[in-house]
A protein has these predicted regions:
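Glycine-rich nucleophile elbow surrounding the catalytic serine of serine-hydrolase chemistry
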Residues: 38-46
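Pocket-forming structural segment of enzyme catalytic cores
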Residues: 22-26, 31, 47-109, 124-130
Length: 142
C-alpha cells in the first residue's frame, strides 16, 4: 500500500509497484480468480475502466453510505471507514456497480462482475478487530 497511480506519481517505487500489480492482475483475470483491491488496489483496477479521479486527500475516519444493489445489501446502510488516500474516485464506468459512496459523492466501494473484482477504498485490515460487515462484504466475493 501507500502508492499512487502512475498518472499522479512517476517515482521508481510507483513504476515498480505498477509493473508487479499488472502481472498479478493479468494472471488473476486469465485464471478467473476473484480479486480484492484495497485502497491503491481499488484505484489501480478502476483506472483500467476509464475512471475519473480527483485529488481529494482523505485521512482519518468518515462515513459512507451503501447503495441498494445486487452485490451487497447490508441492513445497516451507513458505515464508518478509515481513509489513507491522496486521490478519490469521482466517476466510474457504467459497467461497474457502485456499492458505497461518501457524502461528497466520491466512490468508496465498487464491484466489477465481469472480472469478479471488489474494490474498497478503506482498509479493513487496519482495525484492531476485523469487523463483521467487512468480513461479510469480502465473503460475498468468494
Amino acid at each position: 500500500g501507500g502508492n499512487d497511480l502512475l498518472q499522479f506519481s512517476n517515482t521508481d517505487k510507483d513504476k515498480f509497484r505498477s509493473k508487479i500489480d499488472n502481472l498479478y492482475y493479468k494472471k488473476a483475470k486469465k485464471l478467473e480468480i476473484p480479486m480484492l483491491g484495497i485502497c491503491y488496489g481499488a484505484t489501480f483496477v478502476a483506472n483500467k475502466f476509464n475512471t475519473k479521479f480527483s485529488k481529494k486527500k482523505k485521512v482519518g475516519y468518515h462515513k459512507i453510505n451503501f447503495l441498494k444493489n445486487s452485490f451487497f445489501n447490508p441492513k445497516n446502510k451507513v458505515l464508518e471507514v478509515n481513509s489513507f488516500k491522496n486521490y478519490s474516485i469521482n466517476k466510474l464506468n457504467n459497467k461497474i456497480e457502485i456499492l458505497g459512496t461518501h457524502k461528497d459523492k466520491t466512490v468508496e466501494a465498487f464491484f466489477i462482475s465481469k472480472i469478479k473484482f471488489l474494490g474498497l477504498m478503506w482498509h479493513p485490515e487496519r482495525y484492531n478487530k476485523f469487523r463483521k460487515i467487512d468480513f461479510d462484504l469480502i465473503k460475498k466475493l468468494i
